[in-house]
């Protein structure tokens, strides 16, 4: 029997909305949207969400669930290198229970804020894996590599993941950054991803110190952070911006999701327009780490922009509604007409594009996966209603056709 999900408003792929309609689901696939008068109890199992807005599930395109536990242990810091120094030290003193509990708490916060897909960064060779699989959340699983873990590309766990990708679990490779990998090692990671046909991601242009490092200027990464590494990374490049450097060594024009991108030159913007790299912005994290916001005027109009919370190591929450509301308040100055519509697109279809999953999720369309959420109406405008929502307003959450929450 087909499922029919009714709601007062349904957000459509063109960011308009339908009324008096229902989304039809066959197993885990969206079959289409039909008017309510066509529904019959004999053919459809009807779920009536009444006075609510139904939309695609949110996609948190960049998060570190495994680092939840670090939030309580961080000391005040004045710069990005000071913060990174602490994170490196803390990560060396982990235990399995800390990681497991962190991931479970992070998953609860994510699901309760309407997230149905995450772009999880995993740096502990799979300690977050079981909890993620058990939760049922759709996952783009970015396996993180740095100089210190470069041998992990030969690990049994990673080789197993390459064989076990499915519709709910999609493996990707994540070289941590240009400053945590030798040029030779970064090229090796790119080649590995090319061989196995996997998408990549990387933290890029996140701090002024990273920019200065790539430009071979004085920076506090070399002064304060590299002493934590076993050896200083070998950066074999002429002075360049991080994006110029990465683009130059990306010889096979692989898809690389660029995370943060809040310190960009005019040349960087030209490269983005030309190459169309997917980008994930994490604006609250940038402010938390004493950095400037991304160029919202550019990214609000860039078609492959996704939104991420980052982790609790660099944010005050991973509640995705908090991230959406923050972006909304800052975007109102840039997009005069209906910024809330574009923000919801970034939080859904934009995230799917950033993770390379837009053929299957991110919008309510025929033949896409049934990843849906609904919120109680708080405003006569369905878009503003979502902007004004909190976790308590989440009425329904569905992942892959299975209801996770219904009130």
Range-by-range predicted roles:
Residues 130-133, 155-278, 290-305, 359:
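Histidine/acidic residue-rich metal-binding segments in metalloenzymes
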Residues 56-68, 199-208:
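Histidine-centered catalytic micro-motifs
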Residues 8, 369-407:
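C-terminal cap of metal-dependent C-N hydrolases
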Residues 64, 123-124, 144-148, 176-178, ...:
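Active-site beta-loop-alpha junctions enriched in small/polar residues
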Residues 1-41, 52, 357, 382, ...:
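N-terminal metal-binding scaffold of metallo-dependent hydrolase/deaminase domains
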Residues 53, 71-137, 158-166:
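Alpha-helical scaffold segments that flank or form the walls of functional sites
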Residues 69-100, 140-143, 208-253, 327-337:
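Active-site gating loops and adjacent loop-to-helix segments of metal-dependent hydrolytic enzymes
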Residues 248-251, 294-377, 389:
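His/Asp/Glu-enriched, well-ordered alpha-helical/loop segment
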